[in-house]
């Protein structure tokens, strides 16, 4: 009876330590910030997630190319049917009636928020969970 109780206790302590570490803030500036973000985003968990997303995008592209062979749509039709993605591979949702300047504003906002997080990490510190939002 003592063995399972001790094992359960040690497991709970381990989980508590992991939770505290994820909440800890670390001040990261310059190259340390960049290295940490790359380390977090390049972990095997993120790579598996991105590989799955990449394969689904390839399948979608293949389907669009097959449609192209059959129907040969105009350039304008093709622009509206293909999914729009940003540099991170995330799909952008955009109203076809909205002006094109809105897309630039979206990208500018993304870059600004990343710069803000970098400045905040350097000044006050940030947690690993906050850094993982950049992936």
UniProtKB/Swiss-Prot annotation:
Subcellular location: Secreted
One GO CC term on file: collagen-containing extracellular matrix
Keyword Nucleotide-binding: no
Cystine connections: 29-122, 41-135, 121-126
Predominant subcellular localization, coarse grouping: secreted
Keyword Disulfide bond (UniProt): yes
Source organism, top-level taxon: Eukaryota
Molecular functions (GO terms): hormone activity
Pfam family, one: Insulin
Gene3D superfamilies hit by this protein: Insulin-like (1.10.100.10)
Tissue expression per record: Highest expression in colon with lower levels in thymus. Minimal levels in testis.
GO terms (BP aspect): positive regulation of feeding behavior
Entry keyword set: Cleavage on pair of basic residues, Disulfide bond, Hormone, Secreted, Signal
Annotated signal peptide: 1-22
Propeptide section residues: 49-114
CDD domains to which the protein is assigned, alphabetical: IlGF_relaxin_like (cd04365)
Subunit structure: Heterodimer of a B chain and an A chain linked by two disulfide bonds.
Function: May have a role in gut contractility or in thymic development and regulation. Activates RXFP4 with high potency and appears to be the endogenous ligand for this receptor.
Annotated family: Belongs to the insulin family.
Descriptive protein name: Insulin-like peptide INSL5
Organism (species): Mus musculus (Mouse)
Gene this protein is translated from: Insl5
């Amino acid at each position: 009876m003592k063995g399972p109780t001790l094992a359960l206790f040690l497991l709970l302590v381990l989980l508590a330590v992991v939770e505290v570490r994820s909440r800890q803030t670390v001040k990261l500036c310059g190259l340390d910030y960049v290295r940490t973000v790359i380390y977090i985003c390049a972990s095997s968990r993120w790579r598996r997630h991105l590989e799955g997303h990449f394969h689904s995008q390839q399948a979608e592209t293949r389907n669009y190319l097959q449609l192209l062979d059959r129907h040969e749509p105009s350039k304008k039709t093709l622009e509206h049917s293909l999914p729009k993605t940003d540099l991170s591979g995330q799909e952008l949702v955009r109203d076809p009636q909205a002006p094109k300047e809105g897309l630039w504003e979206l990208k500018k906002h993304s870059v600004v928020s990343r710069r803000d997080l970098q400045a905040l990490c350097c000044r006050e510190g940030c947690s690993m969970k906050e850094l993982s939002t950049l992936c």
